[in-house]
Curated annotation (Swiss-Prot):
GO terms for biological process: DNA-templated transcription. This is DNA-directed RNA polymerase subunit omega. Its EC number is 2.7.7.6. The keyword Transcription applies. InterPro entries: DNA-dir_RNA_pol_omega, Pol_omega/Rpo6/RPB6, RPB6/omega-like_sf. Keywords: DNA-directed RNA polymerase, Nucleotidyltransferase, Transcription, Transferase. It catalyses: RNA(n) + a ribonucleoside 5'-triphosphate = RNA(n+1) + diphosphate. Gene3D superfamilies: 3.90.940.10. HAMAP family: RNApol_bact_RpoZ (MF_00366).
Length: 67
C-alpha cells in the first residue's frame, strides 16, 4: 500500500492549517459512521488524508453547515 504524504495532500489544499482542519473534520465524520469516499482499510485519519490527496475532500467542506 502506498504511503500518503503531506506533499500529496498539499496539491489539493495548499494551506497546511486548512489541510489539518479539513482532514480532522473528515476523520471525525468517518468515526461517526459516514462512508469513506476512497477504498481503504486504514484508520479514519489515514482515510481522511487519502481522500484529500485524491481530491474528493477539499477545504469547501469547512464552510458547509452540517444538517
Amino acid at each position: 500500500m502506498a504511503r500518503i504524504t503531506v506533499e500529496d495532500c498539499l496539491k489539493t489544499i495548499p494551506n497546511r492549517f486548512e489541510l489539518v482542519l479539513a482532514a480532522t473534520y473528515r476523520a471525525r465524520q468517518l468515526v461517526q459512521g459516514h462512508s469513506p469516499r476512497v477504498e481503504s482499510r486504514d484508520k479514519a485519519t489515514v482515510v481522511a488524508l487519502r481522500e484529500v490527496a485524491a481530491g474528493v475532500t477539499d477545504r469547501d467542506m469547512l464552510t458547509k453547515v452540517p444538517l
